[in-house]
Each structure stands twice: as C-alpha cells, then as structure tokens.
C-alpha cells in the first residue's frame, strides 16, 4: 500500500514538472566540415603518394617525409622559378600545378607512375593553399 501511495505521489510530482510549451523541434543542419589541415595533406597525400612511395624521400628533392615536407615546400622556389607552395594562391603553386597537370609544368603530372589524385584530394590541397597553407 505504501508503495502504491509513493508511486502515485511521484507521478503527480513528475506531472507538475511538465510544461505547457509546444515548441516545435528545429532542425539544426550539420556544421560545415572542418578546414583541411596540413596534417591531413601529409597523412593522405604526401605519405602514401609521394614520400613513402620512394619518389620524394631521403635524398630526392623536395623531401616530403613527415616532419620535413612543410619546410621544403612552403615559400620554396621550384626549378621552374615559382614557389612550390605559394600560400593563398594555388594557381601560383608549382605543386598544385603538377598534381592538376596544369600548363607550364616540367615533366609529367604527379604522382608520377601512379594514379592521379582524386578530385577530392586535389580539392583538399587547393583549400589548404587558399587558406594560406598553415602548418597545422
């Protein structure tokens, strides 16, 4: 009997806590994806397609190994006379021109001897450069 009385009192207390609010649920669209970081470029492009493939590691310039790639690319002049990475400007970044097979490149499209980078990966490099090529 005491249990039933306690259950009834608890039910009344819970009902008293309710509100008369009839707010509609609002759909909150997902946030935009986070910006592309240099770490993403290193882990998803340079490591599998450039450095670890043996093309740009150790003595082969520019060395794109983790810990060295950023300093070897950003604001560093290419043999073609333009910076490998010109922060803020993919069209003036030789690396971007090479991966998109743009006009004026010396040699072949990168990565050489392998499949071209996907459009998503190329877009990631473009975004990173457009953001100023931060070392994040």
Where are these regions (language model features)?
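C-terminal motif of bacterial Sec signal peptides marking the signal peptidase cleavage site
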Residues: 14-16
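Short, linear, compositionally biased motifs with a strong N-terminal bias
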Residues: 10-12
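Flexible coil segments in periplasmic/lumen-exposed cytochrome c-class electron-transfer proteins
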Residues: 119, 131-136
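Solvent-exposed helix-loop boundary motif
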Residues: 18-35, 39-123
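Bacterial N-terminal signal peptides that target proteins for export
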Residues: 1-7
């Amino acid at each position: 009997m005491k249990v039933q009385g306690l259950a009834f009192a608890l039910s009344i207390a819970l009902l008293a806590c309710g509100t008369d609010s009839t707010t509609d649920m609002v759909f909150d669209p997902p946030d935009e994806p986070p910006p592309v970081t240099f770490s993403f470029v290193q882990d998803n492009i340079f490591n599998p397609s450039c450095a670890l493939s043996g093309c740009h590691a150790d003595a082969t310039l520019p060395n794109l190994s983790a810990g060295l790639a950023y300093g070897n690319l950003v604001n560093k002049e290419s043999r073609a006379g333009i910076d490998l990475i010109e922060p803020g400007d993919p069209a003036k970044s030789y690396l971007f021109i090479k991966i998109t097979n743009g006009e004026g490149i010396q040699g072949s499209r990168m990565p050489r001897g392998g499949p071209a980078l996907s459009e998503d990966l190329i877009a990631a490099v473009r975004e990173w450069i457009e953001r100023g090529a931060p070392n994040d």
